């Protein structure tokens, strides 16, 4: 049988039909308050990685500089990104034009909700026309750059649309009136996104609830943020996964100095 490479082979023919069918199925539900036209779509269009300066001017994921990823000021300014796209070879399909079609179809179906997308490389997306068609720019793991993006693009409504369930994500939101909220990815653990070296683990263990529905520490942490009820929860961490260790005198010390600042997912994973 023919081996498909996924929906991308059928997107041009079926995108409008699929999008509108999804909206018809749920648009009367009161929990729907906005429509997303894409999740981290920048990965699927060439040039976006190179434009950001985060990947050593390549389009290769293995070249990503994690230190630059977390810095408050991205390596490439809007002017540099703009110049990159001016000189980039024209492609058959562009992310900006595709987004414009999806946003147009969404508004043909519903003008009462905002159109949003989850951006993983926003410094590129703000210069490709992608964000021009959005009512709200959603960000994937970008609390460190909220202030920068607000400064450079002050007229765009912004919020977190993929955030790990950790205090630093919520703290970045409540300290900034211009960040409308966060979306925790994910509320419950799910099967998938595991790599070969993580076998036999098959689930992604990031949710406030595990696969069996049992709460993790992060569940109670966010409960304490979002309710007036007093909350106390005590959890432990294994010595192997902890960023702390005991020295020769039995004192608790960091395995790597100041590592807690660089690995917020690690020290709060309980």
Q: Which residues does each predicted region cover?
A:
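Beta-strand-loop-alpha-helix segment that lines the small-molecule cofactor/substrate pocket
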Residues: 1-4
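An active-site-proximal structural segment forming one wall of the substrate-binding cleft
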Residues: 11-34, 108
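Flexible, glycine- and charge-enriched loops at secondary-structure boundaries
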Residues: 8-12, 92
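Polar helix-capping/helix-linker motif
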Residues: 7-8, 29, 176
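Substrate-binding clefts and catalytic carboxylate motifs of secreted carbohydrate-active enzymes
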Residues: 33-36, 42-139, 144-270
């Amino acid at each position: 049988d023919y081996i498909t490479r996924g929906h991308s082979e059928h997107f041009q023919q079926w995108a409008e039909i699929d999008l509108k069918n999804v909206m018809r199925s749920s648009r009367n539900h009161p929990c729907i308050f906005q429509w997303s036209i894409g999740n981290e779509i920048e990965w699927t269009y060439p040039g976006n990685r190179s434009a950001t300066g985060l990947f050593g001017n390549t389009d290769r994921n293995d070249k990503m500089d994690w230190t630059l990823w977390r810095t408050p000021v991205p390596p490439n300014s809007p002017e540099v990104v703009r110049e990159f796209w001016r000189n980039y070879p024209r492609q058959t399909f562009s992310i900006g034009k595709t987004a414009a079609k999806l946003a147009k179809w969404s508004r043909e179906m519903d003008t009462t909700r905002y159109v949003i997308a989850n951006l993983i490389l926003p410094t590129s997306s703000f210069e490709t026309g992608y964000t021009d068609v959005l009512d709200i720019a959603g960000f994937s793991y970008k609390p460190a750059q909220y202030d920068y993006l607000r400064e450079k693009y002050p007229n765009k409504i912004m919020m977190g649309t993929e955030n790990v369930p950790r205090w630093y994500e919520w703290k970045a939101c409540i300290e900034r009136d211009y960040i409308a909220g966060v979306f925790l990815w994910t509320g419950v653990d799910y099967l998938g996104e595991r790599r070969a070296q993580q076998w036999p683990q098959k689930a992604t263990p990031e949710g406030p609830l595990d696969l069996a529905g049992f709460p993790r520490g992060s569940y109670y942490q966010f409960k304490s943020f979002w309710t007036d009820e007093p909350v106390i929860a005590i959890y432990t961490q294994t010595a192997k996964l902890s960023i702390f260790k005991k020295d020769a005198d039995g004192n608790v010390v960091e395995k790597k100095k100041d590592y807690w600042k660089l690995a917020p997912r690690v020290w709060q994973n309980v």
